[in-house]
A protein has these predicted regions:
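A short, Trp-centered hydrophobic/proline-enriched beta-strand micro-motif
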Residues: 6-21, 59-63
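A generic structural signal for short beta-strands and their flanking turns/coil linkers
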Residues: 10-12, 35-37, 55-59, 69-75, ...
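Short glycine/serine/proline-enriched coil/turn segments at secondary-structure junctions
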Residues: 23, 67-69, 120
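Hydrophobic residues embedded in beta-strands of well-ordered beta-sheets
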Residues: 24, 38-39, 117
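Hydrophobic/aromatic beta-strand elements that line small-molecule binding cavities or substrate pockets
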Residues: 29-32, 75-77
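A short mixed-secondary-structure module that forms the rim of ligand-binding clefts
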Residues: 32-67
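Charged, gly/pro-rich active-site loop segments
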Residues: 72-130
């Protein structure tokens, strides 16, 4: 898992895809943390992304590694409501503390079950990393 977290942190911004009915929706994300050997992300339960995940919990994200290499990760969203997980996200990304706290009701953290991660290149076959 560390490899995925490291790549996402190095890329600084990665793109997170959901579906809205039969339409794809993609948005930039910039926060990820590893906690208890899982890769965690966050959302706000008042957003369209949260509603879309509720309707279809399968998501994919993509991050550039270099000019010709990128990471793709997909899986099923599983929310984790424990305050200690929220606090880990806040500690890793202090900029979120101006919007959220570990005990508020809109800050949602989640990991991906059955997560699959692959590194792609225009010059070689995909490398499965999890």
């Amino acid at each position: 898992m560390n490899r995925i977290v490291n790549i996402l942190n190095q890329s600084k911004i990665f793109f997170f895809a959901t579906t809205d009915g039969n339409q794809p929706r993609v948005r930039p994300y910039n926060a990820v943390v590893e906690f208890e050997d899982k890769v965690y992300f966050y959302t706000n339960n008042h957003t369209r992304a949260f509603r879309q995940i509720s309707e279809n919990p399968f998501i994919e994200l993509c991050a550039m590694i270099s000019e010709d290499r990128w990471l793709r990760v997909n899986g099923k969203v599983v929310y984790d409501y424990r305050p200690e997980v929220k606090q880990a996200m806040l500690d890793a990304h202090p900029e979120l503390k101006s919007m959220y706290s570990a005990d508020d009701k809109i800050f949602e953290v989640f990991y991906l079950s059955n997560m699959q991660g692959t590194i792609h290149s225009n010059h070689s076959e995909p490398e499965v990393i999890c």
